[in-house]
Amino acid sequence: QGIVDQEKLRLVIGPGTGLGVCGLIMSPSGWLPIAGEGGHSDFAPNTSLEFEILTLLTKKFGHVAVERILSGPGIMNLYETLCQINNKEMIYESPSEITASAVNGGNDPLAHETVQMFCKIFGSVAGSMALTVGALGGVYITSDLVRNFLDLFVASEFQKSFESKGRLKPVLEDIPVYLSKKKNMGLIGTVYQINNQWIQKGFKI
């Protein structure tokens, strides 16, 4: 949903080993990336449970950047804190085990809660970053991690959380969100950028 404005800035965001964030603007020679370190911005909780999560992660890490949650290692951090809050033993020891359990209906309901919480926080962060850069051209999610639980992601509170920005909710409602299903997006982008840099000189891959 949303309205595409082809001439406006776009936001690309992707949880993986960390949280990658960049902008894309159109130039006479094609799309140009605006690099940044958005994954290291502060995690801002919105609910009492999220405040509890922040408190536990602060004790562990000191500064809690959003990629402490929105990444593969972040899913592990989130699962660990939810187990602590609920006084439960950790059953799983890797992000892949957690997401697989959530998708397949495993025997630990906290795995499912972890993925749901991940999606909700991801929506909030993506919405904030879309407002920060003015991403009226759309938000593009590129993440092998999210594709591991695609159906859960689509049915999650991501979109609701993305749009829940008070007076700016109407702005977020008009920003389309896309999830790329292609793999190796980093490599594809690298090839495109090489072409983009040299196109004026007549080189082509």
Regions of interest found by a model, annotated:
Residues 30-40:
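Eukaryotic endomembrane system proteins
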Residues 11-14, 19-25:
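Short beta-strand scaffold segments in enzyme catalytic cores
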Residues 28, 48, 52-205:
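ATP-binding/phosphotransfer module of carbohydrate and carboxylate kinases, centering on a glycine-rich
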Residues 1-10:
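Conserved phosphate-binding catalytic cores of ATP/NTP-utilizing and phosphoryl-transfer enzymes
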Residues 38-44, 63:
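Charged, low-complexity surface segments at secondary-structure and domain boundaries
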Residues 18-22, 41, 145-146:
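Gly/Ser/Thr-rich beta-alpha loop segments that engage phosphate groups in nucleotides
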